[in-house]
């Protein structure tokens, strides 16, 4: 049960409605169930009989879709009125499981396709909804947040575009670099972290998990994850260490300078449980290399906590490292699409974020 007192003090801007794009519908339904439950409890706990219109509903979900023409072109369609509402549009730009037909050929939806559908729904609601908010757990083009060569600034461009379309607030999780919000200084940009949900999942699923400096250590897999590891270690009061990547800057492979080695900086990990924390697992190669090195250094158990499990190269390598004893647990959230077979893996733990989203 949420903190009723905090919810009671908040006054809604307008009646809430949730428009979930197809790739995020499952998560949105869970959020809707919890939001309905929270508000029913709040109404029951209130002594006052004055309840704002639209505050307690059987569901806050709005029926919407983005159908396609035979050529693959799409359109946004909201099937019920959202006039005067506080509209939250939920989108998962990483959900590659959805497909659509292009001239008879099946095409998997890319992040670009999801982003275009988001703009279509915004366009359908602009000028009608009282306020438009976008919940985009994985920030579109979040890894293209800066320019180091002759390249585009896709994330900043997307944020500016959404702002220009009338979006008041953008809600995301564990942005690769939250400083990208500087591109829209006059709009709301909320960046949340699933730290509590990681701890909750670990304590619930690992019975002998010990939260003290003698048994636990937090590890940053690279320089970019340092702020996350520092925060995690500070709230737990334990030591932290980090790896940094040595790259070969003379060559480029798949658009990146290849990693030559991971070098470790930190105290002895021998006999300790270590938690590696980062914002995402893409292919997972560098993360798995870090787990191997930590086990080689004598770590008793290695847990990986990552907000987004993308698994772009599949799960075979993770299975291999689990069987070899390099990886003990992998904790990731349900904020983005997860392959169904992942739920059957003995090392996988899901950190449920639906309650947190409902409270937001």
Model region roles, listed by residue range:
Residues 1-360:
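PRPP-associated nucleotide enzymes
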């Amino acid at each position: 049960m949420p903190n009723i007192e905090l919810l009671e003090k908040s006054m809604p801007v307008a009646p809430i409605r949730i428009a979930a794009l197809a790739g995020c519908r499952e998560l949105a339904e869970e959020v809707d169930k919890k939001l309905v439950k929270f508000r029913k409890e709040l109404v029951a706990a209130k002594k006052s009989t004055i309840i704002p219109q639209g505050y307690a509903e059987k569901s806050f979900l709005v029926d919407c879709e983005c159908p396609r023409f035979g050529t693959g072109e799409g359109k946004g369609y909201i099937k019920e009125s959202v006039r005067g509402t506080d509209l939250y549009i939920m989108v998962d730009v990483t959900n590659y499981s959805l497909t659509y037909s292009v001239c008879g050929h099946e095409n998997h939806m890319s992040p670009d396709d999801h982003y275009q559908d988001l703009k279509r729904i915004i366009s359908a609601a602009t000028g009608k909804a009282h306020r438009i908010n976008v919940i985009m757990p994985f920030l579109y083009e979040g890894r293209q947040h800066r320019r180091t060569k002759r390249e585009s600034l896709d994330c900043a461009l997307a944020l500016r575009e959404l702002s220009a379309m009338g979006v008041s607030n953008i809600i995301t999780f564990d942005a690769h670099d939250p400083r990208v919000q500087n591109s829209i200084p006059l709009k709301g940009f909320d960046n949340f972290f699933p730290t509590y949900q990681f701890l909750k999942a670990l304590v619930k699923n690992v019975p002998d998990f010990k939260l003290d400096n003698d048994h636990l250590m937090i590890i940053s897999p690279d320089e970019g994850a340092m702020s996350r590891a520092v925060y995690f270690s500070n709230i737990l009061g334990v030591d932290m260490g980090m790896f940094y990547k040595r790259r070969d800057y003379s060559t480029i492979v798949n658009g990146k300078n290849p990693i030559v080695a991971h070098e470790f900086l930190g105290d002895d990990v021998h006999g300790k449980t270590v938690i590696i924390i980062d914002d995402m697992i893409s292919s997972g190669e560098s993360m798995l290399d870090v787990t191997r090195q930590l086990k080689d250094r004598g770590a008793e158990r290695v847990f990986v906590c990552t907000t987004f499990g993308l698994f772009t190269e599949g799960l075979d390598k993770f299975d291999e490292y689990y069987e070899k004893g390099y990886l003990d647990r992998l904790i990731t959230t349900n904020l983005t699409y997860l392959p169904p077979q992942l739920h059957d893996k003995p090392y996988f733990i899901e950190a449920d974020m639906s309650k947190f989203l409902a409270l937001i």
